[in-house]
Amino acid sequence: MGDVEKGKKIFVQRCAQCHSAQANLKHKTGPNLNGLFGRQTGQASGYVYTDANKAKGITWQADTLDVYLENPKKYIPGTKMVFAGLKKANERADLIAYLKQATNL
């Protein structure tokens, strides 16, 4: 299990430029991540996804996020996400722990 506070720092440094996590905030360059867990790829209301994201058809959970966050372009070829990924498993675990808390409020 990851460290929520470390995950928050990673989110602020690596994700917050393009994503928000709190309810009722608009999409940025990337979709708002509120309600992420349990949602299928390409399904955030009001955000325009690539066909690749819409067609992937997986549900976001800790295990799918772990694989995606390691190398987004490998997991979903054709995604427009420019983030190269987090290679360290502990950093992914920390970010996922934060996202579980922050996106389900």
Swiss-Prot record:
Keywords: Electron transport, Heme, Iron, Metal-binding, Mitochondrion, Respiratory chain, Transport
PTM info: Binds 1 heme c group covalently per subunit.
InterPro entries attached to this UniProt entry: Cyt_c-like_dom (IPR009056), Cyt_c-like_dom_sf (IPR036909), Cyt_c_1A/1B (IPR002327)
GO cellular component: mitochondrial intermembrane space
Keyword set includes Cytoplasm: no
Gene Ontology molecular function terms on file: electron transfer activity; heme binding; metal ion binding
Blocked amino end (Gly), modified sites: G2
Binding site residues for heme c: C15, C18, H19, M81
Subcellular location(s) per record: Mitochondrion intermembrane space
Task performed by this protein: Electron carrier protein. The oxidized form of the cytochrome c heme group can accept an electron from the heme group of the cytochrome c1 subunit of cytochrome reductase. Cytochrome c then transfers this electron to the cytochrome oxidase complex, the final protein carrier in the mitochondrial electron-transport chain.
Family from the record: Belongs to the cytochrome c family.
Protein name (Swiss-Prot/TrEMBL): Cytochrome c
